[in-house]
Amino acid sequence: MHCPFCSATDTKVIDSRLVSDGHQVRRRRQCLACSERFTTFESAELVMPKVIKSNGNREPFDEDKLSGGLYRSLEKRPVSADLVELALNTIKSKLRATGEREVPSEMIGNFVMDQLKELDKVAYIRFASVYRSFEDIKEFGEEIAKLEK
C-alpha cells in the first residue's frame, strides 16, 4: 500500500475491523517513512452474472435498475433505507449464489418480489402489477388473496 502523503511503500496496519455487514474491512494504517496515518477499505470484487432479457438479449447486471425498481415500489411507504439496502444486498447475494454466468431476468424479478413481500405488501402488489402486467382488477384481487393466505 502506497502512503497517500509521501508515496512510500512501507506501511503497517494499526487496526482492522469489519464494516458493511462483514462485506468490507476497514484498516487504519501508518506510514513507516513519514508516520502519517490513513484509512483504507477492502472488499472482494464480486462479479455479477449477465442478465438474459425476455427477448433473448443479454446485458450486464445493472444495480441502479434493480435499486430504482425497489425504491419506486416502496415510494411513500414506511420502509427505512437500511431495510431497502439489506434487501438489495440479499438479492445480489442470491444472484451470485446461483453460480451462473447468466441468469434470466425472470429470476431477478422473482427475487425482488420475494423481498418486497417481506418488506411491504403494498409495494409487493405495486411491483407485481407492473412485473406481471396485470390487465384488470380481478388479477389484483387474486394476487391480494394469495398474500392473505
Swiss-Prot record:
Q: Which UniProt keywords apply?
A: ATP-binding, DNA-binding, Metal-binding, Nucleotide-binding, Repressor, Transcription, Transcription regulation, Zinc, Zinc-finger
Q: Which InterPro entries match?
A: ATP-cone_dom, NrdR-like_N, RNR_NrdR-like
Question: Which Gene Ontology molecular-function terms are recorded?
Answer: ATP binding; DNA binding; zinc ion binding
For biological process, the GO terms are: negative regulation of DNA-templated transcription
- The record places its unnamed zinc fingers at 3-34
Does the record carry Electron transport as a key word?
no
- The residue ranges of the ATP-cone domain are 49-139
This chain's function reads:
Negatively regulates transcription of bacterial ribonucleotide reductase nrd genes and operons by binding to NrdR-boxes.
Stated family: Belongs to the NrdR family.
Q: Which NCBIfam families match?
A: transcriptional regulator NrdR
Name the UniProt record assigns to this protein: Transcriptional repressor NrdR
- Give the organism's phylogenetic lineage: Bacteria, Pseudomonadati, Pseudomonadota, Gammaproteobacteria, Vibrionales
Gene this protein is translated from: nrdR
